[in-house]
Amino acid sequence: MFSDTGAFLAQTVEPLMVWDKPWIYGPFAWVFHQHISLWGTVPAQGLICSHLIWVLARVLGRATPMYHLGICAALAAFTAAPWSAGMVMPDILTPVAILCAALLGWGWDGLGRVERIWFSVLGVIATAAHLSNLPVIFALVVLAMLLRLGWQGCLRVALPLAGAVALLLVTNLVGHGRFAVSPYGSTFLLARLIADGPAARTIAARCPEAGWYLCAFAGRLPTNSDVFLWVPESPLNRAPDGKAIFLGGRELAPEASIIIAETLRQEFPAVVADVLRNFVRQLRRSQIGDTLTRHDVGFGVRPVLAKGFPPEEVARFDGSRQMADDLKPLARRLVPLHSLVLLVAAGFALMAWRRAHLARNARALGLLLCILVGITGNALATGALSMPHHRYQARVVWLLPLAAMLFWRLPQSGDEQRRSSPSSASAGTRRASCRNGSPIN
């Protein structure tokens, strides 16, 4: 769990529309835990990932039960995948959104009717679950256009994005009375621009004439965006007279939009340079371990559990290894192994890219590039919109070893076409049974 887990649980326990989080992941998690046990949500997230991996392997012509078990076992042992899937947070839905968009775009012919509907719905929910997913999936739409997937294929890739935007508009209108994708998201972008410097310089140059609330803090604004957003003593949460501000991030959003617009007009090249610098910083941060301590959980999760879940679930939470601070030492021992696996996987993924390009395998090339663009796009989006943290990139970086295992040695195009159909497995079973003298009707 993480400190934000309490807010997502509160979305259905209270129920509550949290100002800084889409009303998406809380209801999604509720479908599986039903306010009984969070052990319903965690296996469900793992099964969703497993199914996506199975279908991806199938459309590539590589799906067999033993091969699938081997891939899942390797991901569980050597990557951050189980650490993200095992967290009651929307982090795991970022790679889910990427894989859904990839399969809808380049694996459509290999999907059954139910799978097409399922991945469309799942892709919409996964994309809407975290605002940083929107630019990531937009990057995949651009990729589809660059690869000339065709207008139907591009529309299929764009379906999760369009559906997510519609879902966010409706939920924010109902919950906040504002027809907006992110009613108060400007506060987060302002925090990033202040920490990087451009917005802080704008405030210093325009104050006190501008009359902004933040003019009172010109020249002494925090240089850490997390401090600005969450520390009780920050200008966002405490007025110059020392009085605490309730939901300061929500209240500052209109002024934040004005300052952001002024900053972009005055210092656009500097903002772009900072975005690229933060992108590189985020791309290099992908280790597990920054959400695993008792301190990372904070004090907001237990009260929600106590209010909405049985006492047995609260007792399990209190007795968990995370609350005993036993998880981070284990994670620290795995970090060197994970880093080595990523380094090796990057080489195999690049070789697979070259082979798919030389073979003119459009399906494999599109799916592989979708994964690679999704990984880098995630770093760009989170680096631009937030302070770089390991968990932001750890949630998707396991897709690189997955790509290395699935793509580095693909079957011949004829074999791929025969084995990518959803009915191919059952057809193979029928042929085997006929050879054994036991035809299946």
Explain the meaning of each model-derived region.
Residues 101-118:
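Membrane-interface transmembrane helices that cradle and orient dolichyl/undecaprenyl
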Residues 83-93:
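Short acidic/glycine- and proline-prone juxtamembrane loop motifs at membrane-interface regions
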Residues 182-313:
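Membrane-proximal stem/loop segments at transmembrane-domain junctions that anchor or position
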Residues 1-8, 16-28, 32-36, 181, ...:
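Extracytoplasmic catalytic/substrate-binding loops of multi-pass membrane glycan-assembly enzymes
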Residues 35-44, 277-371:
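Membrane-interface anchor segments at the N-terminal boundary of transmembrane helices
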Residues 39-67, 73, 77, 96, ...:
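Transmembrane-helix motifs of polytopic, lipid-linked glycan transferases
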Residues 116-130, 141-142, 160-170:
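Membrane-interface alpha helices of multi-pass inner-membrane proteins
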Residues 132-146, 157-161, 182-183:
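Transmembrane-embedded, aromatic-rich helix segments that form part
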